[in-house]
Amino acid sequence: MPKKTVSVTTSITDQNYEVSLKTRNFTLKIDQPKPSGNDTAPTPLEFFLFALGACTCTIGKTIAEQRKIALKSIDVRIDGEINTDFLLGKTTDDRAGFYEINVYTKIDAPLTDEEKQELLKEIDKRCPLSDNIQEISKVNFVLE
């Protein structure tokens, strides 16, 4: 079974809530809305949902190419509800993560609704991010 390690680095300073993100030859940033942050970039939660949407799109395109489907587009809208009081430390009576994540997907391709539903099931099955959300992956926090 071929395996690939994917690595990223992130850092924050005492100056603000902007987080610098680096991977390969890319540098991005994350921020928080005002008043905590400067509202100059998406939040970590938004990036998380962006990543799931992007994975849905790219896995869908890969499957379409493999099956020779004349895919015109895949459009994804995602939302999730979260208790911000928990992550801000105002309560301990809940959990930090999203309660539920809804992935609304439009597939523009010459397929029946049933075929589109089957394609969406295959996308969900093959998307690594969906897998990591639905199946618990061990996360190790290691102090360096």
Which positions does each model-derived feature cover?
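Alpha-helical metal-binding/catalytic segments enriched in His/Glu/Asp
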Residues: 52-56
